[in-house]
A protein has these predicted regions:
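Bacterial N-terminal signal peptides that target proteins for export
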Residues: 1-9
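Signal peptide cleavage region of secreted peptide precursors
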Residues: 20-23
Length: 104
């Protein structure tokens, strides 16, 4: 019975520490996403390494969401399967990059 109580307490403490990490927001260049589900501060998004689309629990880094993008046509493919006119437009949509060039 004592072992069960200790195990229950340890599990509860582990879940509490995980929950507090999951709601924590972080700034530019800081680690985000991943197993802990760390969120970025407002005005930022969690950008994953290019080509790392649809990988469960992968971490990224917080990047600024651009407010203005120049109209330069250099298409990139987002992890959402959409082709963006340039990398700035992709970042403004808060989408990680799959690859340079149009989506297939």
């Amino acid at each position: 019975m004592k072992t069960k109580s200790i195990l229950t307490l340890a599990t509860t403490l582990a879940l509490m520490s995980f929950a507090s990490t999951a709601v924590q927001a972080v700034g530019v260049g800081k680690l985000c996403g991943g197993f802990a589900g760390i969120q970025c501060n407002p005005g930022l998004f969690c950008q994953h390494k290019a080509g790392a689309c649809f990988i469960f629990d992968i971490a990224g880094t917080c990047a600024r969401v651009p407010r203005f993008c120049f109209r330069i046509f250099r298409p990139v493919c987002g992890c959402d399967g959409k082709t963006y006119g340039n990398d700035c437009e992709r970042q403004a949509a808060m989408v990680s990059k799959s690859h340079n060039g149009k989506c297939q």
